Amino acid sequence: MKAKFLIEPFPHVLLEDYFTKGEWEACIRELRKLDPHLLPPEFSGTARHKETGRPLKFNSGLFLTEAMPNSEIVQFARNHMYQELVSQVDCSWWESQWRQNNSQSWMLSRYIDGQYYNAHVDLSQFTLLIWLYQEPKPFTGGDLIFPDYNNYTIPCNNNTGIIFYGPLRHEVPPIKGSGRYTLTCFTSCQNPALVSTR
């Protein structure tokens, strides 16, 4: 896994080749098994419009933390999240904040033709996203956009990802094609007394 810390236009970490080849293949097998069980927005957690209360997303998802606590995808992702990642981040204050996270919630989402997630914020301190799909890329659109930062855009390439502050407004425009999966980890520090050094 390769990690690159960027300070502009806001502090974030770009991730490449997140899973090894063997891990990626195991992830794809697990995705195929989970796919029929993914739920619509009303049942899979979603940010909602402040005035109407309607879901801001149109995709399918499942919280793996509750539904599949022994998920291989989650186990593989955790293997790369701390020592391997922070050894590549040359920013002590960011590293300190990242290490303090002691609570994780994992979600798997699927975006297919016409699906999207309107601009919203997350309740997490950090949000980690990893994109997965089988090559060749079976869709267009669906990149990650930060509208408050001049539409700063992160392409959702296979086996890549990003870590950013959850309260930053972000969105996913509609996808055209058969789509992709997103593995999301919402992290936070629930109890500072429980913080361990990783």
Regions found by a protein language model. Give the residues of each.
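Non-heme Fe(II)/2-oxoglutarate
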Residues: 1-93
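Catalytic core of non-heme Fe(II) oxygenases with the double-stranded beta-helix
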Residues: 87-198
